[in-house]
Amino acid sequence: MMKIGIDIDGVLTDVEQWQLDYGSKYYYEKYGMKIKNYKGYEASEIFDVDKKLDDEFWNEYFREYSINVETRKFANEVIDKLKEENEIYIITARGSFLSHSTGVMSIEENKTIVLNWLEKNQIHYDNIIFSPEDKLDICKQNKINLMIEDKPENINTISKEIPVICYHANYNEQCNGKNIYRCYSWYDIYRKIKEM
Protein backbone atom coordinates (compact mmCIF):
# COMPACT_ATOMS: atom_id res chain seq x y z
CA MET A 1 0.00 0.00 0.00
CA MET A 2 1.23 3.46 -0.94
CA LYS A 3 0.19 6.93 0.06
CA ILE A 4 -0.38 8.78 -3.20
CA GLY A 5 -0.50 12.59 -3.27
CA ILE A 6 -2.54 14.21 -6.03
CA ASP A 7 -2.54 17.89 -6.98
CA ILE A 8 -5.77 19.48 -8.28
CA ASP A 9 -5.01 22.20 -10.86
CA GLY A 10 -3.16 20.77 -13.84
CA VAL A 11 -3.59 17.17 -12.65
CA LEU A 12 -7.29 16.69 -11.95
CA THR A 13 -8.05 19.61 -14.28
CA ASP A 14 -6.49 20.85 -17.51
CA VAL A 15 -5.67 24.29 -16.17
CA GLU A 16 -3.21 24.84 -19.02
CA GLN A 17 -5.88 24.68 -21.73
CA TRP A 18 -8.38 26.51 -19.52
CA GLN A 19 -5.98 29.46 -19.09
CA LEU A 20 -5.27 29.51 -22.84
CA ASP A 21 -9.00 29.44 -23.69
CA TYR A 22 -10.34 31.87 -21.10
CA GLY A 23 -7.22 34.03 -20.97
CA SER A 24 -7.08 34.56 -24.73
CA LYS A 25 -10.77 35.52 -24.77
CA TYR A 26 -10.41 37.89 -21.81
CA TYR A 27 -7.18 39.61 -22.81
CA TYR A 28 -8.15 39.91 -26.49
CA GLU A 29 -11.66 41.27 -25.87
CA LYS A 30 -10.56 43.66 -23.14
CA TYR A 31 -7.07 44.72 -24.28
CA GLY A 32 -6.54 43.38 -27.82
CA MET A 33 -3.74 41.18 -26.46
CA LYS A 34 -2.61 37.79 -27.70
CA ILE A 35 -0.85 34.76 -26.26
CA LYS A 36 2.84 35.61 -25.82
CA ASN A 37 4.17 32.37 -24.30
CA TYR A 38 2.02 29.27 -24.65
CA LYS A 39 4.52 27.42 -22.43
CA GLY A 40 3.91 29.70 -19.44
CA TYR A 41 2.76 28.14 -16.18
CA GLU A 42 0.73 31.09 -14.90
CA ALA A 43 -1.70 33.20 -16.94
CA SER A 44 0.59 36.17 -16.23
CA GLU A 45 3.42 34.35 -18.06
CA ILE A 46 1.21 33.20 -20.94
CA PHE A 47 -0.01 36.74 -21.66
CA ASP A 48 3.01 38.65 -20.30
CA VAL A 49 0.92 40.81 -17.98
CA ASP A 50 1.66 42.42 -14.64
CA LYS A 51 0.08 41.44 -11.32
CA LYS A 52 -2.69 44.02 -11.69
CA LEU A 53 -3.94 42.58 -15.00
CA ASP A 54 -3.41 39.02 -13.79
CA ASP A 55 -5.49 39.72 -10.67
CA GLU A 56 -8.14 41.36 -12.85
CA PHE A 57 -8.40 38.20 -14.97
CA TRP A 58 -8.61 35.85 -11.98
CA ASN A 59 -11.08 38.12 -10.17
CA GLU A 60 -13.30 37.78 -13.24
CA TYR A 61 -12.94 34.01 -13.72
CA PHE A 62 -11.70 32.27 -10.56
CA ARG A 63 -15.14 31.47 -9.16
CA GLU A 64 -16.32 30.14 -12.54
CA TYR A 65 -13.17 28.02 -12.85
CA SER A 66 -13.39 26.66 -9.31
CA ILE A 67 -17.02 25.62 -9.56
CA ASN A 68 -17.34 24.49 -13.17
CA VAL A 69 -13.97 23.36 -14.53
CA GLU A 70 -14.19 19.81 -15.82
CA THR A 71 -12.04 17.00 -14.54
CA ARG A 72 -9.61 15.31 -16.86
CA LYS A 73 -11.07 12.29 -18.61
CA PHE A 74 -11.11 9.14 -16.44
CA ALA A 75 -9.53 10.89 -13.41
CA ASN A 76 -12.24 9.71 -11.01
CA GLU A 77 -12.29 6.20 -12.49
CA VAL A 78 -8.53 5.73 -12.15
CA ILE A 79 -8.43 7.28 -8.66
CA ASP A 80 -11.12 4.82 -7.54
CA LYS A 81 -8.98 1.95 -8.86
CA LEU A 82 -5.91 3.32 -7.10
CA LYS A 83 -7.89 3.83 -3.89
CA GLU A 84 -8.66 0.09 -3.71
CA GLU A 85 -5.03 -0.60 -2.77
CA ASN A 86 -3.65 2.80 -1.73
CA GLU A 87 -4.41 5.87 0.35
CA ILE A 88 -5.25 8.95 -1.71
CA TYR A 89 -4.24 12.41 -0.48
CA ILE A 90 -5.40 15.51 -2.34
CA ILE A 91 -2.71 18.16 -1.78
CA THR A 92 -3.48 21.67 -3.01
CA ALA A 93 -2.53 25.31 -2.49
CA ARG A 94 -6.19 26.17 -3.17
CA GLY A 95 -7.93 27.38 -0.07
CA SER A 96 -4.77 29.20 1.03
CA PHE A 97 -3.52 32.76 0.71
CA LEU A 98 -1.38 31.64 -2.27
CA SER A 99 -4.47 30.91 -4.32
CA HIS A 100 -5.84 33.27 -6.98
CA SER A 101 -9.00 33.37 -4.89
CA THR A 102 -7.88 35.97 -2.36
CA GLY A 103 -9.64 38.86 -4.14
CA VAL A 104 -12.71 36.79 -4.97
CA MET A 105 -13.69 34.75 -1.93
CA SER A 106 -12.64 33.89 1.59
CA ILE A 107 -10.25 31.02 2.25
CA GLU A 108 -13.09 29.07 3.89
CA GLU A 109 -15.43 29.60 0.93
CA ASN A 110 -12.67 28.47 -1.41
CA LYS A 111 -12.17 25.28 0.63
CA THR A 112 -15.91 24.60 0.57
CA ILE A 113 -16.01 25.06 -3.21
CA VAL A 114 -13.09 22.63 -3.61
CA LEU A 115 -14.79 20.01 -1.41
CA ASN A 116 -18.07 20.41 -3.31
CA TRP A 117 -16.26 20.20 -6.66
CA LEU A 118 -14.49 16.98 -5.64
CA GLU A 119 -17.80 15.48 -4.49
CA LYS A 120 -19.69 16.62 -7.62
CA ASN A 121 -17.01 15.05 -9.83
CA GLN A 122 -16.86 11.86 -7.76
CA ILE A 123 -13.20 12.25 -6.84
CA HIS A 124 -12.85 10.01 -3.79
CA TYR A 125 -9.93 10.41 -1.41
CA ASP A 126 -8.79 9.56 2.10
CA ASN A 127 -7.42 12.94 3.11
CA ILE A 128 -7.21 16.47 1.74
CA ILE A 129 -4.52 18.97 2.62
CA PHE A 130 -4.99 22.67 1.86
CA SER A 131 -1.61 24.23 2.30
CA PRO A 132 0.52 27.08 1.00
CA GLU A 133 3.57 25.26 2.37
CA ASP A 134 6.27 23.59 0.35
CA LYS A 135 4.69 20.40 -1.01
CA LEU A 136 7.86 18.45 -0.27
CA ASP A 137 7.42 19.20 3.44
CA ILE A 138 3.77 18.13 3.20
CA CYS A 139 4.83 14.88 1.51
CA LYS A 140 7.41 14.20 4.22
CA GLN A 141 5.05 15.02 7.10
CA ASN A 142 2.36 12.72 5.70
CA LYS A 143 4.74 9.98 4.51
CA ILE A 144 3.57 10.30 0.90
CA ASN A 145 5.24 7.64 -1.28
CA LEU A 146 4.34 9.07 -4.70
CA MET A 147 3.16 12.52 -5.86
CA ILE A 148 1.19 13.29 -9.03
CA GLU A 149 2.03 16.89 -9.93
CA ASP A 150 2.27 19.32 -12.85
CA LYS A 151 4.01 22.42 -11.47
CA PRO A 152 7.69 22.42 -12.52
CA GLU A 153 8.98 23.83 -9.22
CA ASN A 154 7.13 21.16 -7.22
CA ILE A 155 8.14 18.34 -9.57
CA ASN A 156 11.82 19.24 -9.34
CA THR A 157 11.77 19.69 -5.55
CA ILE A 158 9.67 16.66 -4.60
CA SER A 159 11.49 14.30 -6.97
CA LYS A 160 14.67 14.78 -4.92
CA GLU A 161 13.00 12.70 -2.20
CA ILE A 162 10.20 10.58 -3.69
CA PRO A 163 8.95 9.54 -7.15
CA VAL A 164 6.79 12.09 -8.97
CA ILE A 165 4.44 11.42 -11.83
CA CYS A 166 4.65 14.54 -13.97
CA TYR A 167 1.31 15.14 -15.68
CA HIS A 168 2.53 16.42 -19.04
CA ALA A 169 2.00 20.06 -19.98
CA ASN A 170 3.84 22.49 -22.24
CA TYR A 171 5.06 24.34 -19.16
CA ASN A 172 6.73 21.28 -17.59
CA GLU A 173 8.43 19.80 -20.67
CA GLN A 174 11.86 20.56 -19.21
CA CYS A 175 11.21 18.45 -16.09
CA ASN A 176 13.06 15.17 -16.29
CA GLY A 177 15.50 13.14 -14.30
CA LYS A 178 15.66 10.59 -11.54
CA ASN A 179 12.30 9.96 -9.87
CA ILE A 180 10.31 11.87 -12.55
CA TYR A 181 7.87 9.79 -14.61
CA ARG A 182 6.07 11.67 -17.37
CA CYS A 183 2.49 10.62 -18.10
CA TYR A 184 -0.06 11.94 -20.60
CA SER A 185 -3.43 10.71 -19.32
CA TRP A 186 -5.01 9.17 -16.25
CA TYR A 187 -4.84 5.65 -17.65
CA ASP A 188 -1.18 6.30 -18.51
CA ILE A 189 -0.73 7.19 -14.83
CA TYR A 190 -2.51 4.01 -13.78
CA ARG A 191 -0.28 1.88 -16.01
CA LYS A 192 2.86 3.56 -14.65
CA ILE A 193 1.82 3.06 -11.01
CA LYS A 194 0.99 -0.61 -11.64
CA GLU A 195 4.50 -1.07 -13.10
CA MET A 196 6.22 0.51 -10.08
Where are these regions (language model features)?
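Short, Lys/Arg-enriched, disordered terminal segments
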Residues: 1-3, 84, 191-196
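Active-site neighborhood of HAD-like aspartate-dependent phosphohydrolases
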Residues: 1-53
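Short hydrophobic segments within beta-strands
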Residues: 7, 91-93, 148, 167
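Short, flexible active-site-adjacent loop segments at beta-strand->alpha-helix junctions, enriched
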Residues: 16-18, 94-95, 170
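Flexible, glycine-rich phosphate/dinucleotide-binding loops
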Residues: 21, 97, 173
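Short, basic/glycine-rich phosphate-binding loops at helix/coil junctions
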Residues: 46-62, 95
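Substrate-recognition element of Asp-dependent hydrolases with the DxDx(T/V) motif
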Residues: 66, 75-111, 131
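C-terminal cap/substrate-recognition subdomain and adjoining C-terminal extension
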Residues: 103-146, 151-196
